[in-house]
Amino acid sequence: MKFLQQNSFTQTSMSQPHEDVSPPLRHPYLTGNFAPIHKTTNLTPCTYSGCIPPELTGGQYVRNGGNPVSHQDLGKDAHWFDGDGMLSGVAFRKASIDGKTIPEFVNQYILTDLYLSRKTTSIASPIMPSITTLVNPLSTMFQIMFATFRTIFLVILSNLPGSQQAIKRISVANTAVLYHDGRALATCESGPPMRIQLPSLDTVGWFDGVEAEGEPEISQAGSDDSPFGGSGIFSFMKEWTTGHPKVDPVTGEMLLYHNTFMPPYVHCSVLPKSNEKAPGHRLVNQPVLGVSGARMMHDFGASRSHTIIMDLPLSLDPLNTMKGKEVVAYDPTKPSRFGVFPRHLPSSVRWFHTAPCCIFHTANTWDSQSSEGELSVNLLACRMTSSTLVYTAGNIRPPVRSRCTQARVWSDEREETACRYKEAPALESPGESTGLADYFPITAESDDYDQCRLYYYEFDLAMESRNHVKSQWALSAIPFEFPSVRPDREMQEARYIYGCSTSTSCFGVALGRADKVDLLVKMDAKTLIQRGKKMNATSITGCVDRRSVCEILQEQRKDDPINIFRLPPNHYAQEPRFVPRACSTEEDDGYLLFYVFDESQLLPSGDCPPSATSELWILDAKNMRDVVAKVRLPQRVPYGLHGTWFSSQDIESQRSVESLRSLEVVQRKKEEWVNSGGQIRKSWMVLREKLEKAVG
């Protein structure tokens, strides 16, 4: 972690400052191309080189990510997962004259309650506490309580006279985007999805599971069409929805879970398409029993028949402060627990226990049946062997963990089951003899302990009396994150998984010190799983393909199960998304779309000049070699989180909209309210402004 080693940071964010060193107040996730950009652009034609595939005509690629409204203080608590949601998209419009495809760039803030409140008040810093504040071991109980009560105070203030935008939901909608049943939705786990309009990326309103704000009222709603949350004092928490909902490409159902601080902690919902309301198919806020506590739960697995909830030992619990722990805390003495249940029967959950880990993203989930008829549910996920990323993405030095390899026994008294596992500090490493050290130095701070690898789990459902993890090992030794598959192969046994990697470090550390993605990977998961089973890979610590990034790049065999596209020097990519070629018969026949930034544009200080721009690259996903087109954008796109491809049919099939959210309308209403109320209202607004400035 070079940044952490070479720079003294603030006492609250890093370590004790050296008395002779003046610490540079620069946060790696607020500088360079991580720095937010505040210019928004309506649909603007772009130039391009190469040939744009006809499959893209009429569609749009959109990527979501955190983009803080203000970041003047580069030394303050900040985390890569913080920030107001901003969408950046490229639409491919067909010209009416010559029929050519014209790419058009657009980017817009998502107008959440927090964003609108922040822009129409005198509040100087984010309304919500930073994740950094919650995970920092040096954060005192007073600091956390102050940040929490400050948020509560500002939420209450936003509901008093003079506010034209009350804060009813605390989501920044900065995580991902998806399409379901005529709606494009932006997500974040601190609130419900937010509907956006394509291709303009305007904000429509919050989606509550039945309808979105800004849509025409539903004339007839079914008796079971209840919204997220239901009723009760804690109903607002049951609106909090995963940042990664899953849409079944066959049935059109959208699967979601809602994660809260209160038992039973997790609820699940299944929303069918509006024209397919078979009895029993719609579920809203159904409890998943057996979750061990409040968890930082970012993703889940979903096959055509089953859902997998991950109860990992990474807690997100305000009550931790009473126990002398951080609100977000990782406990490597506890196991990882995977709850598997039929899609529409969460009450039938079965819990599988194994070694502790962190998983932020799943790649794919599918059902399989042996020749004897035994049923298994399979999961591919990006498995981290530590919680390092949670800390380093906030520029915090991770807690030191002793390396332990003794066997532990953990029991769940509620279920009267026991889980015995070897607490391995890492997945099995190929070690220096295979050349891995060329890219991943084996040091105290950067070794297998911090690796993130594409990992295979097989949950055996054949024996009702025993919950057994039949297989669990890594497919490859290389770092692998931000996974995706061909959309119409999701929830089935997809052969290929696409994702990101890095040639300079490992993801657990690299993302934290703001290293970037310079490799895109295509992994033949089906072949690697078959090899793993044939070689009887070691449970938990096994690794099927032990080659390093360097070795794979040197070999580049035609039949290699791992193909890597390496970007040119100083060029860095973001998460790729697959678009299939028309009438394709082979699973990998299509294109990968992703944003690219050339860091040779950076100033000597490491900052981006105003003239810096990004590109959208279109890569042949079959040979992972040919860049068929590059779209030159009018501005840069900061490194962000997740994107998706919206087809022309998606855009044309959007539900009607009556109204859109607008910052200008909110500002105008505020001015009209003040000017129409005489001196009393003006005096109140003066007092209100002082209160806002007083709390920052």
From Swiss-Prot:
Disruption phenotype: Does not impede neurosporaxanthin biosynthesis and shows a significant increase in the total carotenoid content. Leads to increased expression of carAR and carO, but not carB. It catalyses: all-trans-beta-carotene + O2 = 2 all-trans-retinal. Residues 1-16 have a biased composition (Polar residues). Binds 1 Fe(2+) ion per subunit. GO terms for molecular function: carotenoid dioxygenase activity; metal ion binding. Fe(2+) binds at H244, H298, H361, H642. This is Carotenoid dioxygenase carX. It comes from Gibberella fujikuroi (strain CBS 195.34 / IMI 58289 / NRRL A-6831).
